[in-house]
From Swiss-Prot:
Keywords recorded for this protein, A-Z: ATP-binding, Cell cycle, Cell division, Cell shape, Cell wall biogenesis/degradation, Cytoplasm, Ligase, Nucleotide-binding, Peptidoglycan synthesis
Organism: Cereibacter sphaeroides (strain ATCC 17023 / DSM 158 / JCM 6121 / CCUG 31486 / LMG 2827 / NBRC 12203 / NCIMB 8253 / ATH 2.4.1.) (Rhodobacter sphaeroides)
Protein name: UDP-N-acetylmuramoylalanine--D-glutamate ligase
Transmembrane segments: none
Family matches, as InterPro entries: Mur-like_cat_sf, Mur_ligase_C, Mur_ligase_C_dom_sf, Mur_ligase_cen, MurD
NCBIfam families: murD (TIGR01087)
Amino acid sequence: MIPVRGLEGRKVAVLGLGRSGLATARALEAGGAEPLLWDDSPEARAKAEGQGFTVTDLTRERAFEGVALLVTSPGIPHLYPAPNPVIARAMAAGVPVDNDIGLFFRSFATRDWDAFDQMPRVVCVTGSNGKSTTTALIHHILSEAGRPTQMAGNIGRGVLDLDPARDGEVVVLELSSYQTDLARALTPDVAVFTNLSPDHLDRHGGMGGYFAAKRRLFAEGGPDRAVIGVDEPEGLYLAGQLSVAPEDDRVIRISAGQKLERFGWSVFARKGFLAEWRKGRQMASIDLRAMPGLPGAHNHQNACAAYAACRTMGLAPRQIEAALASFAGLPHRSQTVGEKGGVRFVNDSKATNVDSAAKALQAFPKIRWIAGGLGKDGGIVALQPHLGSVVKAYLIGHSARDFALQIGATDHEICETMERAVARAAEEAQPGEVVLLAPAAASFDQYPNFEKRGEDFMEKVKALL
């Protein structure tokens, strides 16, 4: 646990009592604060009381008298589409609002500077797609190289549940836009921006607000090094804003297709090979085609980001290459479930938006595509240029009929359910083809989350193998 510093003897309200909320309450209590907890769910409140915490109705009048801070969970809206009533009440009372990420940065290692021969460091990863894989890959590379490391944030443990800092340790955090938008302190040593595509726009008031939330990680006084994906205009702009000149090697530009030889420091992938260039010289080349856990151009971008971050930590190219080769990948992200009769079954349930689905569709030459769910704003019209590899689409969920109208001349069948889609795709697939779940939609019409959707796909596939 990371005890929260600077709030000793103060009352701190905690809104949202899921995993991060209860971890926050424990960390506040350990640091000497008095946490006051609230959740709309009676079950969540009862659980908190059962653990000995004080539950206070934060919806009542004058609930924030004497309260120094409100800490809220990331899933609770604080501005768009409308502030949660409790957050609105806190802001009206002049009470600052923070989250567990902000508390982490104000507390991690801050009282132990003299105890370390080598200071702990924090690497943060944000972006629209590839965050989890990049975060896990950095953690894996550091572990394989023998460096002490922990992983948390939007993946793995809550940040305040981490163990106290160790000498020379690297903490790797995956941060969503919800987390970066609200945190009052964001001071990573290395910050990674993978890419940007439309997502969560209702929570940020549009694309500009979404990008602004991501950019907060790179605010002045932020990271010593920045790793920036420049395959979209926003990343290109961000890299330019952070650089004092093209040869500035404090910013490492990464790409999944562009040659970036003219910059101070760059890492890019072309035709399956990763190349590192610094100050006009090629420093390394790695064959990513030999990495079974990193198929496709989108994973090559993830590899470039992780490689660059680990190079800033002093790791040698050959150390990183060996770890890339042993990385097994993450569940529900280009995950091979099995193969039968020359047909491969791949679970990419995490491809919940157009951009991530497009990258999944580019990874294989002949695809039986299972798509659909709860469609997002704009539908999937933007996927039409990427459907050349699709032999046939099998459409499921609430958006099935809308998707059928949006995929042009691509052969398709409305299946409604995962069971029928898997059965039909497996029945019609030919040797050399891939049955790919890449929904391009949220899961909430039929499943509680994308993990359950992916598990259902794998269950149906394994029954056929």
